[in-house]
């Protein structure tokens, strides 16, 4: 994916495998602006030093000297490691979490499963069951809870839980309780469609303006406010429809005799959605990267150039058609 990138993959080495690649910031348009450690050598030293105290972690080097694969115990495990390194002054990039699979005794592909226990008020029960159903969860038990509401028990592929926790909090308005337990390995269940809309992607490098943001927020939900440095290919919001959309959030209003720059003061913008590290890890897709620095967390497309992204998508469609 380009020189100067390291990679780490989150997975569970013993039970409940899940994974996500991460990298150094060499391919970022804003390298070294917020961190002290930006080189892959420093990233390697830090990752291998972590093995001395973090017994659940495993680090593997790849064919590329600046890419690594890190195996952990889940999304939270990776998030804690990334946040710790971020506060220490490291810059890195992370890609979408994935799940580790294995080949069973019969030669078939197997994946990890989790047992999910949920306590939820009755009014949100249907929404939770529907959301888990699309993630290939199977209901094992349903009974009244001790303090009211319903107690639900599911068995679900670990892949189905990736990105679900924040969605669960939204579905239950923060009133639900969710806990998981590793169940074991089972047959591969096939593709799981992620209920994910497209992204609003910055088409130019610059600083966001109220005028540019006001046009963009008509197309979806923004992640950035005015006065924020952005670059081409950076994800600045969630598209209200499927598919990514390029937007110019740096666009300025053309001044005339009847208009002045002070007229931007009259533009009212909806406050942007605060995307924490955990939320970003759950949001990014296969063609996205999460750029983490001590001062900011930014999501971007793996390929920053819009024309190159379209060509790559066309090649993928042609490969699938064959």
Spans of features found by a protein language model:
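Accessory interaction regions appended to the cores of large information-processing enzymes
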Residues: 1-322
């Amino acid at each position: 994916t380009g020189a100067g990138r390291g990679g780490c993959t989150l997975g569970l080495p013993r039970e409940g495998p899940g994974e996500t690649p991460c990298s150094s910031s060499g391919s970022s348009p804003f390298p070294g602006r917020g961190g002290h450690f930006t080189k892959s050598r420093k990233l390697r030293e830090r990752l291998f030093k972590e093995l001395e105290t973090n017994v659940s972690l495993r680090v593997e080097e790849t064919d590329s000297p600046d890419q690594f694969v890190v195996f952990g115990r889940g999304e939270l495990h990776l998030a804690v490691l990334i946040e710790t390194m971020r506060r220490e002054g490291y810059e890195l990039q992370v890609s979408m979490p994935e799940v580790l699979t294995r080949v069973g005794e019969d030669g078939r592909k197997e994946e990890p499963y989790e047992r999910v226990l949920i306590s939820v008020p009755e009014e949100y029960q249907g929404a939770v069951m529907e959301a888990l159903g699309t993630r290939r969860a199977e209901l094992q038990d349903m009974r009244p809870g001790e303090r009211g509401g319903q107690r639900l028990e599911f068995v679900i592929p670990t892949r189905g839980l990736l990105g679900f926790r924040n969605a669960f909090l939204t579905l239950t308005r923060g009133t639900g309780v969710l806990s998981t337990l590793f169940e074991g390995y089972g047959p591969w269940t096939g593709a799981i469609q992620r209920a994910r809309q497209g992204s609003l992607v910055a088409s130019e490098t610059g600083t966001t303006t109220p005028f540019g943001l006001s046009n963009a927020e008509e197309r979806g939900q923004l992640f950035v406010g005015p006065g924020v440095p952005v670059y081409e290919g950076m994800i600045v919001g969630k598209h209200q429809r499927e598919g990514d959309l390029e937007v110019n959030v740096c666009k300025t209003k053309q001044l005339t005799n009847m208009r002045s720059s002070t007229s931007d003061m009259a533009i009212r913008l909806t406050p942007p959605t605060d995307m924490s590290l955990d939320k970003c890890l759950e949001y990014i897709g296969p063609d996205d990267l999460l750029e983490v620095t001590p001062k900011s967390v930014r999501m971007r497309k793996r390929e920053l150039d819009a024309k190159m992204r379209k060509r790559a998508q066309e090649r993928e469609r042609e490969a699938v058609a064959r």
